[in-house]
Amino acid sequence: MTTLTASPNRIAQYWALTKPRVTQLAVFCAVIGMFLATPELPSWKIVVAATIGIWLLAGAAFAINCLVEREIDSRMARTARRPMARGEITVPQTLVFSGLIGGAGMWVLYNFVNPLTMWLTFATFVGYAVIYTIILKPATPQNIVIGGLSGAMPPALGWAAVANDLPMQAWILVLIIFIWTPPHFWALALYRRDEYAKSGLPMLPVTHGTEFTQFHIWLYTIALVATTMLPFAVGMSGLIYLVSVAILDIIFVWYAWQVYRHYTDMIARKMFAYSIIYLSLLFAALLVDHYLRF
């Protein structure tokens, strides 16, 4: 039976399939991209339509991820309560749900935004749900690096929605998230390394050890600091962003150094939590600077 029943509990289960907390951060970055794409305020109709369309396709991609990794999720404490890991939603139901919301998202983007945004968002869906989840994640410890582009695309999707174009500035935003992703995710993988070892996924701390992973977190953090200077260097942002990102970077570097030289699971956990705050505040600083630049 593949009927999508509408009881409150069932709705909550389908909502959980979309990984709402992860989706919220992705859509937040997309919305910031919309505002950065124009010196004026973007059309509220475009902002609303693009937000809905991108959210729906992101949710569809995460639902496929939950489907593919349901057995792996059931073996990990962090993910064992996901609906598919608990057998609360079937494979056919998930496929129907993902197809419905993904199709709806494409329809919204094509009809109310522009075809470029629709195709870019669909390509991002394929990149995450297929290339990363099905092909790369179970095959290589560099999965998060190679497959990170799909997760880094939201600001470019937002930019394309408003400008119908992807200039250098949009790709700088993508690059920031692309470089941010490995230290963010590897911090999680470090303190969850035993769970990942049981799952069978070739995560970097499992295949190459904790010290190797700690060192690469440090390397990517240095690269991240350099990358986050680009908006100011190319004239995309001003002093508000520069001061804000300098403070954010100093804290990120401190956490990365602690993970590298004085590792504990607790400091890795704190770095992971901070990395989410870091990205949110960085994009918020870009937005404030965009309209209040001096």
UniProtKB/Swiss-Prot annotation:
Domain of life of the organism encoding this protein: Bacteria
PROSITE patterns assigned: UBIA
Annotated catalysed reactions: heme b + (2E,6E)-farnesyl diphosphate + H2O = Fe(II)-heme o + diphosphate
Topology class, membrane: Multi-pass membrane protein
Gene Ontology BP annotations: heme O biosynthetic process
InterPro entries in the cross-refs: Protohaem_IX_farnesylTrfase (IPR006369), UbiA_prenyltransferase (IPR000537), UbiA_prenylTrfase_CS (IPR030470), UbiA_sf (IPR044878)
Cell inner membrane is among the record's keywords: yes
Residue ranges crossing the lipid bilayer per the database entry: 22-42, 46-66, 89-109, 116-136, 143-163, 170-190, 212-232, 234-254, 272-292
Function: Converts heme B (protoheme IX) to heme O by substitution of the vinyl group on carbon 2 of heme B porphyrin ring with a hydroxyethyl farnesyl side group.
HAMAP family named among the record's database cross-references: CyoE_CtaB (MF_00154)
Protein name according to UniProt: Protoheme IX farnesyltransferase
The encoding gene: ctaB
